[in-house]
Curated annotation (Swiss-Prot):
Subcellular localization, as worded in the UniProt entry: Cell inner membrane
GO MF term set: potassium ion transmembrane transporter activity; symporter activity
Any GO BP: potassium ion transport
Protein name (Swiss-Prot/TrEMBL): Probable potassium transport system protein Kup 1
Function: Transport of potassium into the cell. Likely operates as a K(+):H(+) symporter.
This protein's GO CC annotations: membrane; plasma membrane
Similarity comment text for this entry: Belongs to the HAK/KUP transporter (TC 2.A.72) family.
Catalysis performed (reactions): K(+)(in) + H(+)(in) = K(+)(out) + H(+)(out)
Keywords annotated in UniProt: Cell inner membrane, Cell membrane, Ion transport, Membrane, Potassium, Potassium transport, Symport, Transmembrane, Transmembrane helix, Transport
InterPro entries given in the database record: K+_transporter, K_trans_C, K_trans_N, Kup
Amino acid sequence: MEKNGTVHTGTVRQSLGLSLAALGVVYGDIGTSPLYAMRECFHGTHPHPATPDNVLGVLSLIVWALILIVSLKYLVFVLRADNRGEGGILALTALLNPWGDENRPPRKVLVFLGLFGAALLYGDGTLTPAISVLSAIEGLKIATPLFHPYIVPITVVILILLFLIQHRGTARVGALFGPVMVLWFTVLALLGIRGIMMAPEVLGALNPLHAVLFFVRDGWSGFQVLGAVFLVVTGGEALYADMGHFGRLPIRLAWFCCVLPALLLNYFGQGALLLSDPSEATEPFYHLAPPWALYPLVLLATLATIIASQAVISGVFSLTRQAIQLRLSPRMRIVQTSSEEIGQIYIPAVNWALMLATITLVAGFGSSSGLAAAYGVAVATTMVITALLVRFVMLERWHWHPLAVAGLTVVFLTVDLAFFGANILKVGAGGWIPLAAGLAVFTVMITWRRGRELVTTHLLAQATPLPSFLEELAAKPPQRVPGTAVFMSGRLFPAPPTLIHHLEHNKVLHEQVVILTVLTEDIPRVSASERIELKRLGQGFYRLIVRYGFMQSPNVPVILRECEPLGLVTDPETTTFYLGRETLIPTEKVSGMPHWREKLFAFMSRNSLQATAFYNLPPDRVVELGQQVEI
């Protein structure tokens, strides 16, 4: 089976094993939506009376949202748009756009859309753990009102513990995620069947005519309820983002064989319950269960929401690494938490920021209904952006007929924009929070990338071409000392400023000089056979270019060891690494970007992870040479 290819093939057993694993990672978010989605339609920000017509109409909307958005749009079409097996909106943006063309309209618009869509996922990353765990714990107040004052404190404690153990990784307990979610979806289905038996006529909601009549009858108020209906598909983007871990086939198998049937049965069961007793709209999910099963159900729901939250947190870690490697974010400390699974990482700065934001949301809103008012805006926006980007993939990568592309795009955007419009109505009720978070992250991304461009432009203007430098060196050879010097350079062609400064000040050079450039390609992974490009320049100089994918982390000492068969032999004890360290001076004289963004870039640059740690260099073998740069 090809682990990172566009199509995962293999035995039925392997596919089923990956499908089981996908249940524990991919479907946690969408799988826990029954806890609150139906309730919000009839007892939320824009509540509707639970009349039979309204119940059948809303249920029909839920059914067809799952079919059109998740089953058709994502499972059939969007999952085809992989970047060498990897999914997610940043991978999709990288697939569409070689960064060198980003200034060509409409390419620049696509880049900005992709970056904004990725930034919005950070807002979703704070809301999903908050609303999921809180909605699970709220089941306790149904058992007894005595628990009501403790719902928020219990939720906060669980979330704090969840974030505190992130540094340990999920290698040991991750194997349990799949079986727990299988049990969860089984319980969803059984509860749904129990509810359907109360009012079998609820199955009539399969007819989309009920959804149409609901809009005809309710008009504007019917449109408003779409914001609550959308909660059933908020995990749709996760299917695409996690494609690289499992492949298309296992994700599709898990959806059509397990997740979709369980969700439909449970939503039908909740609908049947409301047909039988409209007063149960306050908590239709938990009221499906018999009284004796309430406490076990709360425990299982809590485990399922913790697993869903873990998947979202891990997804934010992965997204951050992609952003760092694509030079959209300052360098941060990335910890590998598993020696076997390269995708299992931990980023402390992101973890603590998520924890603070999530706990603040739980304490501030105090209920999952309050959070539901803020939930969905970011995801709805991202889904619209994904639909637009996939349109260009259909045309430019798949070369589909323009009429077919236009037809599919119209269908997808009609549905997505309807949900987007309904969710925009939530902005005043808290929906501004994920939008503000996304805008802040987007500002960081574009400021960091633009700032690095300005620094590069400044340094290139003062740079000496490498051939000219080598000619001058041959004419006036300096004294050479034993050992190897590795000069890190972010640019391919000129001589590194650190090399020139070192030679000017110290008047000596090592016997071996390696000019090393680490490049990040617009693909998830670069194979070992394509990673290293080594060229002898003469006079003991080597030009070493190393390529990584945006899902990989660079390790320079390992690269140097891998260069030995190519003729570059280095001794770690006599190798010195020379790094440039720019001191940025924001100034209004250089009109690169607004002054406030220059100050923001300078602040981020000062506080980013040192190159020594990012490239895994031995600290006692590193020399840093400073340079002032006006931006």
